[in-house]
Amino acid sequence: MSCSSGEPVYKTRVEKILAEINNPHSDYVLVVSHRGDWRNYPENSIPAIESVIRMGVDVMELDVKMTKDSVLVLCHDRTLDRTTNGRGLISDITYDSLMTFKLKRAHGVTTDTLRMPTLREALLVCKDKILVNVDHAYDYYDEIVKLTEELGVTGQVLMKGSHGIDRVNEDMSNHRNNLLYMPVISVHSEAGKSLMADYVNRGLMPMAFELCWNRPGEDIESCVAQIHEMGSKIWVNTIWASLCGGLGNDDDAAYESNDPAGVYGQYIDMGASIIQTDRPELLLNYLRSIGRHQ
């Protein structure tokens, strides 16, 4: 939809974000918040999600596990031990029992009232406001598609993985509508190189590739060149140095050096269009200062 001035008008913020992703000429850089605003709220909690929505983050990365009675809940770990005041495997406990435990803050102190949210609750908070990257969840693909269809959010939910193309195509063939999907390429591994080559040889162009590398050199340079030639976009993780070129290249380096341009600028120069971060406010401020985010 466009207004009389020629500027596009979108019904929802999600429509705008998707338009930027799908526009090959856009210089907008999407910000992905890893587990939400976990420095101020418990990771993967509703307040952590609401906080990054208020910041203007584009994608909320969250992790999913399934309870004993098949309820999808938000948690990175297989166990309750680190993120709640409970103990044991999430897969061994019912949802009702899970609700007797409270979430912990990042420093380990238990909150007064916050419980582990369900994926349903999180998606309703995110609907029309922010894209959702559901991580650690490919085994629940069918269940997640069913839920997103029920809630009307399938088109704003993203899943990533390093599975082969045929496996992904087969899994998606079971559904009329599918989640967005992005391949993850570990650029130094033989499996990663093989997967990248398969996309190139088949002439397939996913919305973006997530690249993971721990040192500079030909491996990452070759991947970047191939992706630019294909016309896809590049997703970079700055959450840990081991995922983005080694020491001195991650969020903490940007923060501790007080030099976000020196760290994040190299990924802009590389042509990255999506950056996952543990410091969303720092990254947003930098991108806005150079006109690459709104």
PLM regions and their residue ranges:
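Phosphate-group recognition and catalysis centered on beta-loop-alpha active-site segments
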Residues: C3-Q294
